[in-house]
Amino acid sequence: MKTFVAKPHEVKRDWFVIDAKGKVLGRVASEVAHRLRGKHKPEFTPHVDTGDYIVIINAADIVVTGNKAQDKKYFRHTTYPGGIRETNFEKMQQRFPGRAIQKAVKGMLPKGPLGYAMIKKLKVYAGAEHPHTAQQPKPLEF
């Protein structure tokens, strides 16, 4: 008996939609990363992108527990000397509602070309509307 190895052109991908309204950031991010990677499928292969497409709606209404809204820091750099900038979760949500969930999921995916391909299958929208109705995404509850 041989171990099954998925081939990139034979992978069947589904579309799922997740309503993030009132859900905790880390719990949503870990489930999304799991599904983007394809670990929920029996044909999972570590070196092949076997994951599904995920659409997250209501990203502006995602929550964090405790004092993380003020205490959690996000860093970026302007590429100029001394150009490090920091912002907290609250300000990030006001300015870019989908970026916090995107950064959380990206940190949970593999680094390198395979991880970059996986994060492209994540679509995040601040409101309840999304342009992917033609793909008929199935609602995902957890």
UniProtKB/Swiss-Prot annotation:
One GO CC annotation? cytosolic large ribosomal subunit
Quote the Gene3D superfamilies the UniProt record gives: Ribosomal protein L13
A GO BP term here is: translation
- Origin superkingdom: Bacteria
Keywords of the record, alphabetical order, are: Ribonucleoprotein, Ribosomal protein
Q: Which InterPro entries does the record cross-reference, listed alphabetically? A: Ribosomal_uL13 (IPR005822), Ribosomal_uL13_bac-type (IPR005823), Ribosomal_uL13_sf (IPR036899)
Query: What Gene Ontology molecular function terms does this protein carry?
Result: mRNA binding; structural constituent of ribosome
State whether it acts alone or in a complex, and with which partners, per the record.
Part of the 50S ribosomal subunit.
- Write out the function statement from the record: This protein is one of the early assembly proteins of the 50S ribosomal subunit, although it is not seen to bind rRNA by itself. It is important during the early stages of 50S assembly.
Q: Which HAMAP family match?
A: Ribosomal_uL13
User: Which family is this protein grouped under?
Assistant: Belongs to the universal ribosomal protein uL13 family.
Q: What is this protein called?
A: Large ribosomal subunit protein uL13
Q: Which organism is it from?
A: Bordetella pertussis (strain Tohama I / ATCC BAA-589 / NCTC 13251)
